[in-house]
Design a protein with these regions (language model features):
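Conserved beta-strand segments of the P-loop GTPase G domain that flank and frequently precede/overlap
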Residues: 14-18, 48-51, 83-85, 286-289, ...
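Short alpha-helix plus adjacent loop in nuclease-associated cores
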Residues: 109-128
Length: 439
């Protein structure tokens, strides 16, 4: 009842209300984005209506004149769903349904439906169900209005009150069960992070607005074959793959769910275990659709979510994707060294430079000469396996002189090995200097 999903092909009228001043539930994103969400959910938008108000109508959210207009549009289009690109109170939603004799769905409920449809893993399904239940708890009263009118005598409670309390208790118990299961999921993820820290494995996370091309970049870098479709929330469940970075070796690259303006808070809370992977990353790759009309607004939305999950202060590289869709020559505005760069997941443009930037931001130092004794063959092989060796020469005494480019952690581990010497450091002009680099 509370998780009713719109069937594929269901016809709907889309309503967006603009407000002249601040108002609860004001929708700041575009109508086109909400229509794209509807398309993703399989809903056919037959007509889009808009209204402008100073504040929401306390009963219907909109005025009665607009209410009659919507009713006529629903009848003319043979539609049985009103999709509202704003947030409604439980009472406003109930009153609209009673007045229009149709299902009314808010933007939040539409996003919850899409997430429920896309969740594939055990963890993802748990998180979506928890978000749905949290939302349902705020809407529960409207499901039992036909029983609320039944009154009890002195010392007795009406049937509606009893049924409502029973349903609230059932939802509350299920929420507690899901939260306990997700605590176990978070514990397992935490153990995985501890293992990676113990093994000194770096984590790089892709973040960004939904449909910015995160999964396409993930596939281009790792050949993982993750589903990458031109639609909102094509990726929901997080994916991890190893990515070789010169001088560091294998890092873990994670592909995460995309963000969107006014992402329901219940979803952010429910996906806490997943989003903690982002908050615990060593480096973020913030993917931006450079061809989008509202680039700055989308960047702000992503930054707001990152701040909410405690990841706003992490080192970040801005990746302006889909640069091939822009006029030739415009990519220069996005090229700001290791902090920002133009890329194209489709053509591969800029991905080689990206790997160098990742190495630099993760702390790869300037080239260092390492002297290995003849018997250190395993150490030599290990350095080659990490992709850290730039050049090699054999000394007269049989020792090996390797020009190595690696992070400080790897160099420290080398310096602690017997008979291994770290000599003066030269600079590779291909790698930008880092703060603290020796000349």
């Amino acid at each position: 009842m509370f998780f009713e999903r719109p069937e594929a092909g269901r016809r709907a009228v889309l309503l967006h209300v603009n407000f002249k001043g601040p108002a609860p539930g004001e929708a700041l994103d575009t109508v086109e984005e909400c229509a794209e969400l509807a398309l993703t959910a399989g809903v056919d938008i037959t007509q889009t209506l808009s209204a402008t108000r100073i504040a929401p109508h306390p009963r219907f959210f909109i005025g009665e004149g607009k209410l009659r207009e919507i009713e006529a549009c629903l009848q003319a289009a043979d539609a049985d769903l009103l999709l509202v690109n704003n947030e409604l109170s439980a009472g406003q939603q109930r009153n609209l349904e009673q007045a229009l004799h149709c299902r009314v769905m808010t933007r939040t409920e539409l996003i919850l439906h899409i997430f429920a449809d896309r969740a594939r893993t055990y963890e993802g399904k748990l998180q979506v169900e928890l978000a749905q239940l949290k939302h349902a708890q705020t809407r529960l009263v409207r499901g039992w209005t036909h029983l609320d009118r039944q009154k009890g005598g002195i010392g007795l409670r009406g049937a509606g009150e009893t049924q409502l309390e029973m349903d609230q208790r059932m939802l509350g118990e299920r929420v507690k069960t899901l939260q306990k299961k997700l605590v176990s999921v978070a514990r397992r993820r935490g153990q995985g992070r501890k293992r990676r820290r113990r093994d000194r494995v770096r984590v790089v996370s892709l973040v960004g607005y939904t449909n910015a091309g995160k999964s396409s970049i993930f596939n281009a870098l790792t050949a993982a074959g993750v589903v990458a479709e031109d639609q909102l929330f094509a990726t929901l469940d997080p994916t991890m793959r190893q990515l070789p970075i010169p001088g560091i070796g294998e890092v873990v690259l994670t592909d995460t769910v995309g963000f969107i303006s006014h992402l329901p808070h219940s979803l952010v809370e429910a996906f806490k275990a997943t989003l903690e992977e982002v908050a615990n990353a060593d480096l973020l790759l913030h993917v931006v659709d450079a061809s989008a009309p509202d680039v700055e607004a989308r960047i702000r939305t992503v930054n707001e979510v990152l701040e909410e999950i405690g990841a706003s202060d992490l080192p970040t590289i801005m990746l302006y994707n889909k640069i091939d869709a822009l006029p030739v020559g415009t990519e220069a505005q996005f090229d700001v060294g290791n902090a920002s760069m133009p890329v194209s997941a489709r053509t591969g443009q800029g991905l080689d430079v990206l790997l160098e930037a990742v190495a630099s931001r993760l702390g790869v130092t300037a080239p260092t000469e390492v002297l290995l004794p003849p018997e250190a063959g395993r150490t030599r092989a290990w350095l080659y396996r990490l992709g850290a060796v730039l050049s090699e020469r054999v000394q007269e005494d049989g020792s090996l002189a390797l020009m190595v480019q690696a992070d400080q952690d790897l160099l420290s581990r080398l310096s602690m090995q017997p008979k291994v010497l770290l000599q003066g450091r030269g600079r590779d002009p291909r790698i930008p200097a880092l703060p603290g680099d020796l000349p």
